[in-house]
Amino acid sequence: MTQEATKPNIQEPRAERYNPHAIEQKWQGQWQESGLYKFDENAPGEKFYALTMFPYPSGNLHIGHWYANVAPDARARWLRMRGYNVLFPMAFDAFGLPAENAAIKNNTNPATWTYANIERMTGQFSRMGTMIDWSRKFATCDPEYYRWNQWFFIEFWKRGLAYKKGGLVNWCPKDQTVLANEQVVNGHCERCGTAVERRNLSQWYLKITDYAEELLDFSATDMPEKVRAMQTNWIGKSVGAEVTFDTPAGPETVFTTRPDTLMGATFMVLAPEHAKVKELTTDEQRAEVEAYVAAAGRKTDVERQQEGEKTGVFTGSYATHPISGHQLPIWVADYVLVTYGTGSIMAVPAHDERDFAFAKKFDLPIREVIRAEGSEGMGDQPSEPYSGEGQIVNSGEFDGMPGGKASIAAIIARLEERGVAKAKTTYRLRDWLFARQRYWGTPIPFVHCEKCGMQPVPEDQLPVKLPENVAFTPTGQSPLKLDEEWKTTTCPCCGGPAERETDTMDTFVDSSWYMYRYLSPNYDGGPFDPSKAGLLPVDLYTGGIEHAILHLLYSRFWTKVMRDMGLTTQSEPFARLRNQGMVLGEDGEKMSKSRGNVVDPDDLVREYGADTVRAFLMFIAPWELGGPWDPQGINGPSKWLSRVWNVFFEEKVSGPEEKMQGADVRFAVHSALKKVNDDFERMSFNTIISTLMELTNALVKAKRSPVFGTPVWEEALDIFNRMLAPVVPHIAEEIWHERGQKGSVHTAQWPQVDEAAAVRDTVTIGVQVSGKVRGEVSISKTASQEEALSAARAIAEVQKHLEGKTVVKEIYVPGRIINIVAK
């Protein structure tokens, strides 16, 4: 592609005033027709893979999509002009419940609804003025894409990373499907807000826990501290010991991070789902325990972990303390989770808040074994637990040892010698619950044969495609289960009758590896063409922090498995991640139709043009923070672009003549260029816009100075034109061609900073007489005090206010102020 290919045959005269609607559609068509933004991997320049999180095709791009995309688009454009070979693709995350629910509502197929939305949103992205390479577009609901979801799943299964088991799961009664722990927010479905129930079902899981420790290592990826903290907390690594207690149902092992408090254990607590609850419950306690277990089963893990009054019930049985031999009552309580540790705990109420609250509620013993330095002890009726470090007391052979980290290793070693404990590391992270009981997702590529059991579909039969004529009404079973023709098949092992797996995959599978598919979206020999691996990893990935423990964690896990499969040498999918903030409603609340505070970007484009909307969204707030929408604020960028147009094309500028020199203009241009470069590096987009606005003001002044029309002026316009290109691409392209330039401004070279011009040799400072400003003077930065004062005294206004007075003091602060005090 040549630069000349992007130059249109423009016959019409130039508009006297800036008219975005006359130029934006024209240039969008020219760019698309010429293939201006198509990525050529063989083009010169260092590769840079820039990627924004792909959207769900819900119908229309909202203002949040614009906010998330225009700033990274501007940065990608800037990199391209600097000589990088930039890959900037886009696709659609197309599977999911909204499409299925829309199909139910509109009596259509989810595919029909989804592909219509994709076509509409693709056009909206183009009207945004992005440099997206649409030749790499795909939708995750394309069979050519989800074929590789199925291939991956079988490969995971071969490696022992995919398995099926029964157990308690989160269930959304509205969406009629299971949810992963990460999809439950405060006890409610993160998508529809319905209170989540617990059900016992046989489900598919992916063994993400095998990678828990490696997922805590962020050394190969540059992620914001908040994202690292969220993932670290979600993985929940705990280092401690497993201690074994004898019970009437056999040995019971508990996990503790504080083995130094072992002698403070005064009771044991089991999770309601613990396998030994039934055996440990005495006949006298059975009815009460069974009722409690049933009630706990109706709560989610999140609800059980919330602060509130503790509940529980005594089983009637006792455990034997492994050191003291004391009998500890065994209770059942829902604040203990069967999924954490072993599902049972040794309760140390003197040194744990939850155990303390439970002991107080049920009048159980509290035994102090860690005493704070300088403390006289808790006494018989402690008011609160002590969870800090200190000195071990009331613990026999351990007395006098320091509590906490300083002694834990030594205590574990002693307990191991006695055969009652062993060192152990646990993680709160649970395996990824992977199956869903809905239609619009990737079919799980397994069949069930009564003779051969569960078998994977052979690779040459992939993809297992979704059937088209299916009843979508949710019943609690997958709609695929109701399609007898589709689910009836043959066993790949024995050739006998078999039934397809009718659950579909969690749609987060689609976004776990999609960044690899962009490398070769039409490749049919694997998930991606291995010869394109040199484009990896994604150099800059941008998107919302709300994905920190879902998409971002899953994609890191997926890449590590791909590495172990030999598909990539990378351990992380993204070299660098940055999160944008959120554009809120004018009222400061999250935008929603119910609140009536939604801003439609299409309306804004129709009124102001895409470049104005782009500039305003970059200017409105620091990009990483976001903020409330300001309906009046967009007028500022709109007026600014009109002034930009006038700088280039208005022949006469009203106002007094300015005394700017060539050095002044070059300083304004090159210092602005230097700052814009720094701000693009830092992703400080709001200050980029403000710097360009300041430069516009300087050039308006320069147009009223002797510099106007000189080579310095022409250089200034050329550099300014290029500086505009990344942030307001349409007006920059129009200006480029109206000025007679060849090719496209977007393939032009980014200007070089003249470091000498970007630094002033002189400084302008205010001159005061007795504290009141009476003028200003331009002097050398290295001027002496006498030189500065001499220049100040030469100002007519200063002389006027000194006339007839006696100077009593002269103050000179270099680079800042001159003050002559007179009486």
Curated annotation (Swiss-Prot):
The record's subcellular location field reads: Cytoplasm
Does the keyword Transferase belong to this entry? no
Cite the InterPro entries for this sequence: aa-tRNA-synth_Ia, Leu-tRNA-ligase, Leu_tRNA-synth_edit, M/V/L/I-tRNA-synth_anticd-bd, Methionyl/Leucyl_tRNA_Synth, Rossmann-like_a/b/a_fold, tRNAsynth_Ia_anticodon-bd, Val/Leu/Ile-tRNA-synth_edit
A single GO cellular-component term from the record reads: cytosol
Keyword list (alphabetical) reads: Aminoacyl-tRNA synthetase, ATP-binding, Cytoplasm, Ligase, Nucleotide-binding, Protein biosynthesis
**Pfam families given for it?**
Anticodon_1 (PF08264), tRNA-synt_1 (PF00133), tRNA-synt_1_2 (PF13603), tRNA-synt_1g (PF09334)
Please report, in chain numbering, the residue ranges of the motif 'HIGH' region.
55-65
The UniProt catalytic activity note for this protein reads:
tRNA(Leu) + L-leucine + ATP = L-leucyl-tRNA(Leu) + AMP + diphosphate
- Extract the CDD domains matched here: Anticodon_Ia_Leu_BEm, LeuRS_core
- The residues that hold ATP are 593
Question: Per the UniProt record, which EC number(s) apply here?
Answer: 6.1.1.4
Q: Which GO-annotated molecular functions does the record name?
A: aminoacyl-tRNA deacylase activity; ATP binding; leucine-tRNA ligase activity
- Biological process, per Gene Ontology: leucyl-tRNA aminoacylation
- The residue numbers the entry assigns to motif 'KMSKS' region are 590-594
The family assignment reads: Belongs to the class-I aminoacyl-tRNA synthetase family.
Note the NCBIfam families from the entry: leuS_bact
Protein name listed in UniProt: Leucine--tRNA ligase
Source organism of the structure? Deinococcus radiodurans (strain ATCC 13939 / DSM 20539 / JCM 16871 / CCUG 27074 / LMG 4051 / NBRC 15346 / NCIMB 9279 / VKM B-1422 / R1)
